[in-house]
A protein has these predicted regions:
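Well-ordered beta-strand positions
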Residues: 48-49, 60
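An amphipathic, aromatic/His-enriched active-site/gating alpha helix that lines ligand/cofactor pockets
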Residues: 36-37, 60-93
């Protein structure tokens, strides 16, 4: 199955869960972080976390269930609540092509650029 882009909104199940996960990852490098979440069907491409209740990840996965399977395998799924949302339009200033933007509401995306 082909992988697709997802944005996931995450939050902690509790303050204790937040403290537990942050302690467990305190000595982890960025490479270790991405490797710990990579499976055959899902991988994290980017991660944003501030001091608020929510944090965000860009996932490349076959489906939303593959994201939950990756989180379960890493031991994180019991510590966070996750809402993955598939994004039909994914563009990045780091990789531009000049193609017409995909309209995610188009019933036939093959007619988009």
């Amino acid at each position: 199955m082909e992988k697709r882009h997802f944005m996931a909104t995450h939050t902690w199940v509790s303050d204790e869960a937040r403290d537990q996960l942050l302690a467990a990852t305190s000595g982890m490098s960025d490479k270790d972080f991405f490797a710990s979440l990579k499976t055959e069907n899902a991988e994290t491409l980017a991660h944003w976390m501030g001091q608020g209740d929510f944090f965000f990840c860009h996932w490349y996965a076959t489906d939303a269930n593959a994201i939950f399977e990756s989180l379960e395998a890493s031991g994180m799924n019991d510590l966070i609540v996750t809402m993955p949302s598939e994004m039909q339009r994914y563009i990045s200033c780091e990789k531009t092509s000049g193609q017409i933007l995909i309209n995610p509401f188009n019933a036939d995306p093959s007619t988009d650029g």
